[in-house]
Every structure is written in structure tokens, then in C-alpha cells.
Curated annotation (Swiss-Prot):
Protein name: Phosphoribosylaminoimidazole-succinocarboxamide synthase
GO MF, one annotated term: ATP binding
The keyword Membrane is assigned to this record: no
Key words of the record: ATP-binding, Ligase, Nucleotide-binding, Purine biosynthesis
Known pathway: Purine metabolism; IMP biosynthesis via de novo pathway; 5-amino-1-(5-phospho-D-ribosyl)imidazole-4-carboxamide from 5-amino-1-(5-phospho-D-ribosyl)imidazole-4-carboxylate: step 1/2
A cellular-component GO term for this protein: cytosol
Origin species: Rickettsia bellii (strain OSU 85-389)
Keyword Membrane: no
CDD domains xref list: SAICAR_synt_PurC
Catalytic activity reported: 5-amino-1-(5-phospho-D-ribosyl)imidazole-4-carboxylate + L-aspartate + ATP = (2S)-2-[5-amino-1-(5-phospho-beta-D-ribosyl)imidazole-4-carboxamido]succinate + ADP + phosphate + 2 H(+)
Length: 236
């Protein structure tokens, strides 16, 4: 019988019958910016489908990630990874904090994608942390930081092309990484999920917000937005 190991805002981790493998289950829950938790019926199924599809595609281009296989509608088998305590946010368009903190016009396109490191802490509102702090806190080595940045940009470039191909613009994505030990060596690996919960996605023609951004503004329309993305990816 699988044992619950961790329950987050939208996913739960369970043990599996195999050592170093876990079961990740997607729920319909969503935590809004104001802390309110709501249910969007069917969201977990769609996110499982989308993330499984994307992780498979990334594996095909040489991006190591924790995804092994989709088990059922809501669950997937993943490799155990020692998680870095960071979110790696890649942005190519001014939105969110760039508008609030720098007064930029929303929608302004950067010459190159910008990488932000954020501490994974809802309690402290995910503060920005720089590379010197990450090194001094002992969270990552210099080589690991460089690998994470290189992989994050490569992932973002691939995802941008993937979404453009289905009429959707990737504005920002939130990635997570960790390390896997192979003997005395360690490998940096992509973890968590890639879905409308972790990406800011706009309709390429109208700039209509999709996925989680739409969920924040109009929860009643959220499911159809997630389904639109899943259906278009299915056709790829």
C-alpha cells in the first residue's frame, strides 16, 4: 500500500513499490494569490496529461527530468530527486513583478529571456534570491547554478516553440530542479510539473490569458482554458 509522503497545494507524493521511485498525484485544488483554495473539477487530470506530454518531449531533446511514466488519469511515476529550495522563473515578456516593481508596460518583449531565482516559501512570499546568496547558503554549487541556468533557457526555448505551434504564447514559466546521486557524482534534473499551473500562457492573437492567470480572474472559465491547451497539445 502506498504511503502519503507530502501533500502540496495541487499535488500529493506517495511512496511506490520500487526504491527511489515515487507516485505523484494531481488534484483539482488551486491556491489563489489571496490564499483562498478552490477546486476546479478536472484540472488535475488535464495537468497530468499536459505535464506527461511535455516531460516526454523534453526527454527526447536530452533534458533529464524525473518523469518515468503516466500511471492513470491523475497519477504518474517519478524518480526521487533531492529538491533545490528554489523556483527558477524564466520570463520573456514583462508581466507580474516587472510591471509592479519596475513600472514596465505589460506585454513588453525582452531582448532575451530573464531568469529569476525565488525561494520556495509561501510563508515568505517567494522572495527573489541572487546567485551569491544561493552559493553562500550552500544550496547549490557554482556548477549546479550554471547548469540550471543553461537548462532553464533551453527548456524555455523549446516550450516557446511548442506553444507557438498551437497558437499560444509562452510569457513566463516556473521551473524546479534538484539533484540525483549516481555513485559519487550528482546530476541536475528537472522536477515538478510543466502545465498551465506553472506557465503564464496568452493566446497568440488576442493576448487573452489562459490557464492559471484566467483561473485567478474567472474560475468558472478555467477548466475550458486548461482543456483547450491539452486538446491542442494532443494534436501535436
Amino acid at each position: 500500500m502506498k504511503k502519503k509522503l507530502y501533500e502540496g497545494s495541487s499535488k500529493t507524493l506517495y511512496s511506490s513499490e520500487e526504491e527511489f521511485l515515487l507516485v505523484m498525484a494531481f488534484s483539482d485544488k488551486a491556491t489563489l494569490e489571496n490564499g483562498e483554495i478552490i477546486d476546479v473539477s478536472g484540472k488535475g487530470v488535464l495537468n497530468n496529461n499536459i505535464s506527461s506530454f511535455v516531460m516526454n518531449k523534453l526527454e527526447m531533446i536530452g533534458i533529464e527530468n524525473h518523469f518515468i511514466e503516466k500511471l492513470n488519469m491523475r497519477e504518474q511515476l517519478i524518480q526521487y530527486v533531492e529538491m533545490f529550495p528554489l523556483q527558477v522563473v524564466v520570463s520573456s515578456v514583462a508581466c507580474g513583478r516587472f510591471v509592479k516593481e519596475f513600472g514596465m508596460d505589460e506585454g513588453f518583449v525582452f531582448d532575451k529571456p530573464i531568469i529569476d531565482f525565488k525561494v520556495k516559501s509561501r510563508e515568505f512570499k517567494y522572495p527573489i534570491v541572487n546567485e551569491h546568496q544561493i552559493l553562500n547558503f550552500g544550496w547549490l554549487t557554482k556548477d549546479e547554478i550554471n547548469t540550471v541556468k543553461k537548462q532553464a533557457l533551453r527548456i524555455y526555448d523549446f516550450l516557446s516553440g511548442l506553444f507557438i505551434g498551437i497558437g499560444i504564447r509562452l510569457v513566463e514559466c516556473n521551473l524546479e530542479f534538484g539533484r540525483v546521486f549516481t555513485g559519487e557524482e550528482s546530476l541536475v534534473m528537472l522536477t515538478d510539473e510543466i502545465s498551465p499551473d506553472t506557465c503564464k500562457l496568452w493566446h497568440i492573437n488576442s493576448n487573452e490569458r489562459l490557464g492559471f492567470e484566467l483561473l485567478e480572474k474567472d474560475p468558472a472559465k478555467a477548466y475550458e482554458s486548461y482543456k483547450l491547451i491539452a486538446d491542442r497539445l494532443k494534436e501535436k
